[in-house]
Amino acid sequence: MELPGAKKTKTGYSTAADVLENLAADVPFVADILEYRQLAKLKSTYADGLAHCIEADGRIRSSFQQTVTATGRISSTEPNLQNIPIRMELGKLIRKVFHPKEGYVFVDADYSQIELRVLSHMSGDENLIQAFLQGQDIHRSTASLVFHTPFDEVTELQRRNAKAVNFGIVYGISAFGLSRDLGIGKKEAQKYIDDYFLAYPKMKTFLDGLVEEGKEQGKVTTMYGRIRPIPELSSSNFMQRQFGERIAMNSPIQGTAADIIKIAMVRVHDRLQKEGLESRLLLQVHDELLIETKTEELEQVKALLAEEMQKAADLSVPLEVDMHTGNTWYDAK
């Protein structure tokens, strides 16, 4: 068909997702192929896969491990209930099949931007700390500083780009990676990163310090002392060393956030038990707790969730919790 943007491989034209996505806007049936693939994946992995895990009482029980991930996050297997899609609407609909028992509702409590809050605390950067203390939209605040624009005049595009930089910095993103994510040139992406570090001057010092710590000690640690060995930093392979630097920057932040959510889980569980409530903690998905809540206990559970999650760590910025209630997991998210 000689489609524009088509990519050829040794065996013929590529049908990889990224290639098809570039063609979809100009060729309608390509969009249909992508949608079909998405639906087939959802059916085989989630609809059919989860159906095989339903037990006699109608519940699905997963196994949770504390020692599998290098960052300290809890992982879920058989089945994995932490990877139910959230970024695509069709995938999110899978959550509609999860509902509480009669007389109960779901309460979903999710830490808001916890890794950025941990980063602000650990780096001690006053500009980032003040933005959180003042309750500002952190992405709009970053856009204002990076693009030298008054806070109230920041455009949605500027905010979206600043959001990508905010979260990218946590993962040690490169100019190449940011340029690919935002669809901009590498030079422009590097300027975004440079301006970010000018806006938050202590951030670069902190992140560079983590890399140096990793190189000198062969490891980095979380705020609570969790150790992450980084043998990649002493590799003879340049790409491996770069990967190691990203690990050094991210692990103390992501690992500290993982430690905090575990502390919150213990606090919430103990409080539910102490107050003799019938509501119970069902699931943890990284920064999110799902509680099967007795209807009569709803307000009490919401209050204790907010209190215990916010008090789980004493940071220089507040821990904020977004909370939603629903008759299905989908409605509560």
Residue ranges and their predicted role:
Residues 1-89, 99, 105, 112-115, ...:
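Conserved "right-hand" nucleotidyltransferase catalytic core of DNA-directed polymerases
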Residues 25, 61-62, 66-69, 144-277, ...:
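Conserved catalytic core of nucleic-acid polymerases
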Residues 99-102, 274-277, 282-286, 313-316:
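A structural signal for short secondary-structure junctions
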Residues 113-124:
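Short active-site loop/helix that positions an aromatic residue
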Residues 115, 135, 139, 257, ...:
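Hydrophobic (often cysteine-bearing) scaffold residues that line and stabilize catalytic clefts
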Residues 126-132, 150-154:
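Short, polar/flexible loop-turn hinges at active-site or ligand-entry regions and domain interfaces
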Residues 200-201, 307-315:
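A common structural junction motif
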Residues 314-324:
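Conserved short beta-strand edge segments in small beta-sheet-based binding/regulatory domains
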